[in-house]
Amino acid sequence: MAMAMVEGAEERGELRPGMKVVEYSGGSTGSSLAFVCAVKGYQCKIVSSDAFAQEKLDTMRAFGAELDVVPSDNGKITAELIKEMIRRTEILAMHDETFFTDQLNNGDIVRGFEKLGSEILLQLNKPIDAFCGSVGTAGMLMGVSKILRKSEYGTRIIALEPASSPFLSTGKKGAHRVEGIAVSYTHLR
């Protein structure tokens, strides 16, 4: 996913040598993006929060990311927290020579996860009744399901979300402590 976002931006000329990459993340995207940026020579700044595991914050830093850590309400992941992380990232993205990967609105993430769908089919090499995946940006579930649905297996796709924040299934927002999923609102442009 991170490599797909960076390489897609490079191919379109939106990201060039010397630029800084910015993103908001609870850890998985941020760690991956920091790693890809380190390999490719880009500076990386991640807006995250103390609601996410210290190990995730440490991993992003270890891969070279500079962090802006937003305080949470007692460690809870809420729509308001995610919106504040996005707001701060959008402000950072206003600076010259900065590229915002914008994971919730970046079509490259789906293409990045299509490779995972192809690998699942190749490795299992047998019918797949169902595929379950948690939803954060939804890129993983969309990319994998796109490939699985093209197969002759008729795979059922199931999105998973915390019981206390069933936004996709009921529209109900709620706080939870499941990192990396359930932002409790839609942020599509």
Set out the residue ranges of the language-model regions.
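Positively charged, low-complexity intrinsically disordered leader regions
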Residues: 1-17
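A short, small-residue-rich loop immediately preceding and capping a beta-strand
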Residues: 15-49, 128-140
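Active-site-proximal loop->helix
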Residues: 29-89, 168-182
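Glycine-rich beta-alpha junction loops
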Residues: 105-106, 136-139, 161-166, 172
